[in-house]
Amino acid sequence: CIAAAKTKKTLADKIKAVVYGKDKGALYAWKVLASGLIYAANRVPEISDTIVEIDNAMKWGYNFEMGPFETWDAIGLKKSVDRMIKEKMPVPAKIKKMLARKKTSFYKTEKGVTQYYDFASGSYKPIAVSKEALSLAVLKSTNKPVKTCASASLVDLGDGVFCCEFHTKMNALNSELIDF
């Protein structure tokens, strides 16, 4: 599963390659990830009212690139829940109810606004964002990067200001980035 993951470009594809592989490592990774996802779902609303707060806590507190609900979206909510049920894992009722309502992801973006699934209302709600905050993901979804290569992207922030987003491992400089 590790060899397959190394061939993938995005974190989401790497995680999918690991947990949906067929070797012992993949089976172990699946069991650990699945139990963590179930645990996170069971903590709403016990420790947090929304999935956004749990995802942010894991990213900000533990330096994860994706929180548990973002990871769940990355591996496919329906596909993973089907597997959990097949393997007799205790899928939370709120997740089953969500899927019964034909909601197949925790997050979605419409017209540049990222929304999260709210268990309490059973609907998607916009993520509250400070007016001073900039999100490269949102900017890149509404405006294509001005220039891009395998090592970096140049994103227009507005007012003649640009952001150079590194894509290299550990944000290391390489010759392609220098030529960029």
Placement of each model-derived feature along the sequence:
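N-terminal glycine-rich phosphate-binding loop for ADP-containing cofactors
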Residues: C1-F180
